[in-house]
Amino acid sequence: MNILTMFSFPFMQRALIAGVLVSLCAALLGVPLVLKRYSMIGDGLSHVSFGALAIAVALGVTPLWFSIPVVILAAFLLLRVADNPRWNSDAAIAAMSASSLAIGILVISRTTGMTTDVDNYMFGSVLAMSKTDVVLSVVLCLAVLVLFILFYHKLFAVTFDESFSRATGLKVERYNTLLAILTALTIVLGMRMMGAMLISSLVIFPALTAMRLFRSFRGVVVCAAVTSVACFCLGLTISFAFSTPVGATVVAADLAVFLTSCLIGLLRRG
């Protein structure tokens, strides 16, 4: 089956549209997150999203609508912890991640059990993408992209030098909060496609790959975006061809590209 035939299926078209947009958003946000050493926040939020979706399924409400405010609140709290010198941010993120997973597992075990819907949210499924999911993903992803572009220069400033940014009158906390909220939205939107357990890889891997190939912030951002979208399309194609889980296949593609970039970096130094 060729690629054109593969994407003639409606569920693959929905997966491609939503996946490309989520991958693009995740890569753009991943660069400042990794540079600011906030990358573990993305991983923590992915576990929070699992706990939220478990509660949503148990209550019989729409998981996405329930998860968005919960994960945004968690992002706000994690950001405050990360900026507070009295707290160990890594420990706080680990505690929230473990607690969210535990809550999710307990809720599932006492209510619906491991249903197909829960499994899809945990590990991702192209078949799980409905038209409503795609429309919501498109609208919110476009909002994330527009906000990132509008505040690009300010995000650049707070990423590299918060002290100087404060001295120039920039509201650093405001833009850090914006970054956390946009990340939370992206994590929730990617849950259906990639799975809550793997969505954070879309935030981390493209940024790490780009940072080994480019030195300028703009170069890293562009490279991360291109890499993320390309790896998603490659992973989606391989997943369909070999009947493998979408999330895991996309992560494997990201990992392969990252290892290749590391090899290129070593050859450059040599």
Residue ranges: model-predicted function:
Residues M1-F9, G113-M129, T237-F240:
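Membrane-interface helix termini and inter-helical loops of multi-pass transporters
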Residues M1-L24:
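Membrane-interfacial amphipathic/re-entrant helices at transmembrane-helix boundaries
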Residues A15-A18, P63-V71, D90-A94, V138, ...:
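Loop-to-transmembrane alpha-helix initiation sites
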Residues V48-A58, M96-V107, A128, V172-T183, ...:
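Small-residue-rich segments of transmembrane alpha-helices in multi-pass membrane proteins
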Residues M193, M197-A248:
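Transmembrane alpha-helical segments in multi-pass inner-membrane proteins
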